[in-house]
């Protein structure tokens, strides 16, 4: 998902999506360790999405503190 689309979402939605992605990352790492992972590139995509969401949440937090 693009950063622009993520910025339009509410923080509660972003937190839910963040939790889902963390769960998915855990599952992917488990599959990697057991040799069942079909697409190792998915780990990179999920980690990037997690970083984007965390960055947007932090930006909103700092914006709220300034006001």
From Swiss-Prot:
Keywords: Ribonucleoprotein, Ribosomal protein. GO terms for molecular function: structural constituent of ribosome. Signal peptide: none annotated. Belongs to the universal ribosomal protein uL29 family. Transmembrane segments: none annotated. SUPFAM superfamilies: Ribosomal protein L29 (L29p) (SSF46561). PROSITE patterns: RIBOSOMAL_L29. GO terms for cellular component: cytosolic large ribosomal subunit. It comes from the Bacteria. CDD domains: Ribosomal_L29_HIP (cd00427). This is Large ribosomal subunit protein uL29. GO terms for biological process: translation.
